[in-house]
Amino acid sequence: MLKAYKYRIYPNSEQRIQIAKTFGCCRFVYNQTLAYRKEIYEKEKKSVSKTDCNNYCNRELKKDYEWLKEIDKFALTNAIYNMDAAYQKFFKEHAGYPKFKSKHDNHKSYTTNFTNGNIAVDFETGKIKLPKLKAVKARLHREYRGQIKSATVSQVSSGKYYVSILVETEHKELAHTNHNIGIDLGIKDLCITSDGKVYENQKIIKKYEKQLVKLQRQLSHKGKRSKNYYKTKKKVAICHGKIRNMRKDYLHKVSHEIISENQVIVSENLQIKNMVKNHHLAKAISDVSWYELTRQLEYKAKWNGRKYIKIDTFYASSQLCSVCGYQNPDTKDLSVRTWICPKCGAEHDRDINAAKNILTEGLRQIA
C-alpha cells in the first residue's frame, strides 16, 4: 500500500531560490498547457491528452523558454498530469472548469518522482536528498520502511516548507473485532456513538478567535503590499496553521480510536457544501470538521480491513424509535433532546438514538 510521511524541511537560501523557481515554472507549465488544451478544443473541437500536453511542453515550451530546462523534469510533467486530472474531474465528476493558477496562491507545491536514487532520506544526518536541491535539512520525527515512489515539496502560507515522501510499504491490519458502531455527527459535540460515547467538539477556532480578530484588524490598517502588511499576514497564517494542526491532531486521535475498536462504522453522508451556505452555522460546521473526520475514517477503514458506510442524508435517524421503529414527527423540532416513544415507552436521548438508527440502517445495507 502507498503511505505518505510528511516532514518539515529547512532549505538554505540557495535551495529556497530553486524551490521558488520550481513552483513558478510548474505554475507556468500548468497554465500554458491548460490554455493550449482549451485553444485546441475551441478551434478544432478536438480532445488533447496529457501525453500531447507533455509533448507540447518538451517540444515547444522548453524551446521558447530556455529557463524551463533548469527545473526538474518530473516536477513539470506532474504539473501537466495535475492539470489533466482537474480537466477529467470537470467532465466526469461535474467539478468546476480548471482555473489558471496565480502566483499569489497561499499554498504552493510540486511533486517529483523517484528514479535511480534521486530521492533519499538519511535519518542519521537528518537530511533529505531531493532532485536539483541536493541534501536538505529536515526534522525527521518518524521513520518508515518501504520503497520511495515520489516526493512533494510544499510551502504553506506561514512560509514553512514541508516534504511529503510517498512510500510503498506493508501495513499490518488491526485484529478483527465483532463490535460495530453508528456515529451521529453534531455541532455541540463532534460526534455521539451508538454506545453512548461522546467525542467533544474542542471549538479550536473559538480559543483563537480574539487573537485572530486582533491580527486581522491590524492587517486591515496596514498599507497593502507594505513590509508590515506581509509581516502581519504571516502572523495570521501562523495562527490559522496552529488551529489546523490542533484540529487535525485531535481528529486523528478520534478516528484511530473508532477504527481500532470497531469492525463496521456507519455515519451519515452529510452534504457539507450545502450546509455551510447557512451563514448562522457556517463557522461552527467548518470548525467541527465533519469532512476531515469522515475522510480519515474512510481511508483508515480501507487500511485496516474495516467497513465504513455512509447512509443517505435524508434518512430519518432522529425521528425513529431505535427499539420498535415508530416514527415520531415531534422530534423534527431540534430543541427536543429527550423523548419517550408513544408506542413502546422506550426513553431516548436524541443523539444516541439517532446513532443507533444509523448503525441499524448501515448493517441493513450490507446484510
Question: Where are each of the predicted segments found?
Answer:
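Generic detection of short hydrophobic beta-strand segments and adjacent strand-loop junctions
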Residues: 7-9, 135-138, 198-201
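Hydrophobic/aromatic-rich, well-ordered segments within soluble, folded domains that form packed cores
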Residues: 9-13, 88, 296
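Long, hydrophobic, amphipathic alpha-helical segments used as structural scaffolds
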Residues: 34, 38-41, 87, 91-98, ...
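Acidic carboxylate diad motif detector
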Residues: 52-156
